[in-house]
């Protein structure tokens, strides 16, 4: 009964979750400028965005259909990653020069390659930089996110392997394209 409903309407749930994540991104962009005073709220919203990203993918895959907002899913994720890096920069863990360089490198690499895999490779790097910020800021959140990641790795091993392959493919594509243009 429930599986049938998810199969028929799962893409609508995925669209709702993508919309919620978009609103979370807007709010994160608004509050990130307040610095450490909003650390807990910021990380709770990041966790909510991460959870909604996992769930919208689940519902879309179970319905075997992309929702109307599926094309915006990666862009919403990218906005959240940029905001997270900006927040780490505001907290003093990265310089604004590094932030600008990294963002420019991401945009140029994606623009030159026209490959979603290249952008996903950068997404992975944004996640690592975000984890570094959490690691340096809060013992509680460090433990929370380590447990969360361990759970994701345990329960979503196959999906994680796919994402690792996409990460490696993205960098291979970008680097091989650059090397072939130099020849």
Indicate where each model-derived feature is located.
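Membrane-interface helix-boundary signature
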Residues: 4-17, 35-42, 69, 73, ...
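Juxtamembrane/interface motifs at transmembrane-helix termini
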Residues: 47, 79-80, 164-165
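Core segments of transmembrane alpha-helices
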Residues: 18-27, 74-85, 100-105, 120-133, ...
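Membrane-embedded alpha-helical segments that form the functional core of polytopic membrane enzymes
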Residues: 16-68, 100, 104-105
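C-terminal membrane-associated helical module and adjoining short loops/tails
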Residues: 1-11, 43, 108-183
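Sequence-level detector for tyrosine residue identity
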Residues: 11, 27-30, 58, 64, ...
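Helix-coil boundary and interhelical linker segments in multi-pass alpha-helical membrane proteins
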Residues: 23-44, 82-98, 132-145
């Amino acid at each position: 009964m429930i599986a049938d409903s998810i199969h028929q309407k799962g893409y609508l749930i995925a669209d709702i979750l993508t919309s919620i994540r978009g609103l979370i991104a807007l709010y994160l962009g608004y509050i990130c400028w307040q610095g450490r005073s909003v650390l807990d709220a910021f990380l709770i919203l990041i966790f909510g965005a991460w959870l909604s990203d996992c769930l919208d993918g689940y519902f879309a895959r179970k319905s075997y259909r992309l929702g109307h907002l599926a094309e915006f899913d990666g862009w919403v994720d990218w906005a959240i990653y940029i905001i997270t890096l900006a927040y780490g920069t505001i907290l003093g863990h990265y310089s604004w020069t590094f932030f600008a360089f990294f963002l420019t490198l991401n945009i140029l690499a994606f623009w030159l390659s026209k490959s979603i895999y290249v952008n996903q490779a950068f997404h992975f790097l944004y996640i690592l930089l975000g984890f570094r910020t959490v690691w340096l800021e809060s013992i509680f959140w460090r433990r929370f996110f380590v447990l969360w990641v361990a759970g994701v790795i345990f329960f979503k091993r196959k999906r994680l392997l796919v994402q690792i392959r996409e990460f490696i493919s993205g960098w291979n594509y970008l680097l091989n394209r650059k090397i072939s243009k130099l020849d």
